[in-house]
Amino acid sequence: MSRTVFCEYLKQEAEGLDFQLYPGELGKRIFDNISKRAWGEWMKKQTMLVNEKKLNMMNADHRKLLEQEMVNFLFEGKDVHIEGYIPQATN
């Protein structure tokens, strides 16, 4: 049986993550308060961000930037700004 959480990103009950995907206190917060769907949305944005800004995960400053963008996206309702990206219109 799947876990249900009140997702802070979606602002509704949704299926929770199966296990903690990120380390530390932030990882616990994500596990307790973010749904699979929201995490999937973040993963898409993260991939675009890493590619656009040419981030290197071996660089501590790049990891810190990515973590801050993740918190902004998942918990503070701020979208990730990716220069030149125009989202597809939904019909």
Curated annotation (Swiss-Prot):
<dbReference type="GO" id="GO:0005506">
    <property type="term" value="F:iron ion binding"/>
</dbReference>
<comment type="similarity">
    <text>Belongs to the Fe(2+)-trafficking protein family.</text>
</comment>
<dbReference type="InterPro" id="IPR036766">
    <property type="entry name" value="Fe_traffick_prot_YggX_sf"/>
</dbReference>
<dbReference type="GO" id="GO:0005829">
    <property type="term" value="C:cytosol"/>
</dbReference>
<comment type="function">
    <text>Could be a mediator in iron transactions between iron acquisition and iron-requiring processes, such as synthesis and/or repair of Fe-S clusters in biosynthetic enzymes.</text>
</comment>
<keyword id="KW-0408">Iron</keyword>
<dbReference type="Pfam" id="PF04362">
    <property type="entry name" value="Iron_traffic"/>
</dbReference>
<protein>
    <recommendedName>
        <fullName>Probable Fe(2+)-trafficking protein</fullName>
    </recommendedName>
</protein>
<dbReference type="InterPro" id="IPR007457">
    <property type="entry name" value="Fe_traffick_prot_YggX"/>
</dbReference>
<dbReference type="GO" id="GO:0034599">
    <property type="term" value="P:cellular response to oxidative stress"/>
</dbReference>
